[in-house]
UniProtKB/Swiss-Prot annotation:
Protein name: Orotate phosphoribosyltransferase
Chemical reaction(s) catalysed: orotidine 5'-phosphate + diphosphate = orotate + 5-phospho-alpha-D-ribose 1-diphosphate
Pathway named in the protein's UniProt entry: Pyrimidine metabolism; UMP biosynthesis via de novo pathway; UMP from orotate: step 1/2
GN (gene name): pyrE
Gene Ontology MF annotations: magnesium ion binding; orotate phosphoribosyltransferase activity
GO cellular component, one term: cytoplasm
Lineage: Bacteria, Pseudomonadati, Pseudomonadota, Betaproteobacteria, Burkholderiales
Amino acid sequence: MTQQTTPDDLSQSFIRFALDAGVLSFGEFVTKAGRKSPYFFNAGLFNQGAMLGQVAQFYAKTLLESGVQFDVLFGPAYKGITLASATAVALAGMGRDVGFSYNRKEAKDHGEGGTLVGAKLQGKVVIIDDVISAGTSVRESMQLIRAAGAEPAAVLIALDRMEKSGTADNIGTHSAVQDVQREYGIPVIAIATLKDLLAYLDASKDPSLGNSREAVAAYRQKYGV
């Protein structure tokens, strides 16, 4: 009998996939906020066709399992464009055919013009991106969606770092994800979270990941929500 995939199984499978792809790596990295992070997630490395197809499956399954109602996908420029379009293809393969749209950084004054490309933004819209750092692209997306007369339904991301906003020394009280949820009253859905990553490291039998587990746990202790 086939075992049904649970959300936890999905997140652990995604973490393994991201590690194998080199998208998720361990070491010493400096974030934009100036913090020394023991891990790094770079969705820009989902740059092969088969790899993008796989990550789109994770996005699509996570979205469907969330139970969120949606009519259109929106991908903020630039990483969100590829992620939203690939997720739309994956959803169609699962029997859910929806439109997708994205924005340009600069408006066109010829052709179709404007800043929006793709399906008309209408009904309930899910914003798809890789992560939420400062929340800037989400806020810009909210403005575009509402200006089009549509309703933001959720934000779907690959990884929730579960990390307080601020800098290395000036640590905030909430994460960017929490701020988005509170400000707009919509859910932020993640394929995997920092908690899932720690669970993966706890369960791993790879001795080389032992130090990484300690470093990630210490980082969460200092900056985590």
